[in-house]
């Protein structure tokens, strides 16, 4: 199938879930993926009377970033795509890449709320998905992390997760667009770039073609499994919030750990590591009279009189 037709079809499938008059924001960096997203979405959204506005985030990290953002908006304007530049201040706390991503998504969520947008479309492709899964494997992540990015997650929609980076590049060429090549995408000091430029090509060479597709298939299978486990954990937690040890002991570990995350999240302890959950789990499955477990947000977990007690 022609690349442009394939991308338009992918976008159309997601747009049809919205209504005429809805506002869809588009995250645009100026790269091939996001430009292809912006132009294909604009084409299909018009047919459905859906409004679109492209959001160009200026992280103010690279020299000349303001000029780059303006250039991206000029490209968008050439296609009669409304655009806005949003400047963010990146506080580097856990690496430039992760810190920039956090600042970008915080900006996305704020502007989506301020503009009452129905969704924000992002241009991640199956190549990005494969990289995400590979990095999760390198970290020893669990099923939820290894399931990669969801097509729909809150306000975020990723129509291109079944499409390749090669398709977005080809679509840009067909549309006469010249994408901006972010120098950071060539910088091997970034882990994701090493996965893209070095690890995946070696895997393709040594194990045969189709590695990216295989990783994406595995991610979807893991997502299906993780969704089922999440459903069962939510069902248990909605029916029994006593945190009695006897009841928790009967649960399979994969469900029990999810129940613990739900309970702790209600107290404000979010995004806990596997090690932190393991410390709480030990109060159930490896009880030796140990003391309370201290977690982020000031949450403390103790085993008292046959049940877990959560306090702040």
Please give the residue ranges for each predicted region.
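Core alpha/beta nucleotide-donor-binding catalytic domains of modification enzymes
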Residues: 1-200
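AMP-forming adenylation/ATP pyrophosphatase catalytic core
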Residues: 2-33, 45, 53, 57-59, ...
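Alpha-helix N-cap and coil->helix boundary residues
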Residues: 67, 210, 272-275
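Glycine-rich active-site loop/lid subdomains used to bind and stabilize high-energy intermediates
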Residues: 174, 211, 223
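Inter-helical turn/loop segments and adjacent helix faces that build the functional surface
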Residues: 202-214
